[in-house]
A protein has these predicted regions:
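Conserved acidic segment of CheY-like receiver
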Residues: 2-14, 18-19
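A structural micro-motif
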Residues: 3, 28-29, 77
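Conserved sequence signature across two-component system core domains
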Residues: 8-9, 34, 52
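Short hydrophobic helical patches associated with two-component signaling proteins
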Residues: 17-22, 112
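A structural signal for short coil/turn segments at secondary-structure junctions
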Residues: 25-26, 74
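A generic structural motif
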Residues: 26-31, 47
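Conserved Asp/Asn-Gly motif in the active-site loop of CheY-like receiver
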Residues: 31-38
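CheY-like receiver
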Residues: 41-130
Length: 131
């Protein structure tokens, strides 16, 4: 089964780069993308993605607010947060919310492959166990 991906980042060049990641290698399809958290929340409700890849610092609603919203409404959604700030406080908040992973920008694509592979495997295992 194809996994649905939602990508959120307020920097167009980063958003474009994340969209060009070889998602199909992992059986994933991008269902939406947005440049602010508020639009991201609307897309979460519209598509109920399996994975949300979100920047932390965005206009309207930040990635932490988006992650809390998604986890409250769709607890099985896996969230990977991205940030250019190496801040312990962001990492703490991410852990408290229950995000799957936390990546620093600029994104190392080798590390991203590891994180996406691990996250997809976890989702598929959980889906299989629920059947």
């Amino acid at each position: 089964m194809e996994l649905k991906i939602l990508i959120l980042d307020d920097e167009y060049i980063i958003l474009d780069g994340l969209c060009s990641f070889p998602w199909e290698m992992y059986g994933c399809r991008i269902v939406g993308k947005a440049m602010d958290g508020e639009e991201g929340m609307e897309l979460i409700d519209r598509y109920q993605p399996d994975i949300i890849l979100s920047d932390i610092k965005m206009p309207e609603k930040d990635g932490i607010q988006v992650a809390k919203y998604a986890k409250e409404k769709y607890p099985d959604t896996e969230i990977i947060l991205l940030t250019g700030y190496d801040s312990f406080s962001y990492a703490q908040q991410a852990i408290t919310i229950g995000v799957a992973d936390y990546l620093l920008k600029p994104v190392n694509f080798r590390e991203m492959h590891e994180v996406i592979g691990k996250t997809c495997k976890k989702i598929r295992k959980n889906q299989f166990e629920r059947q």
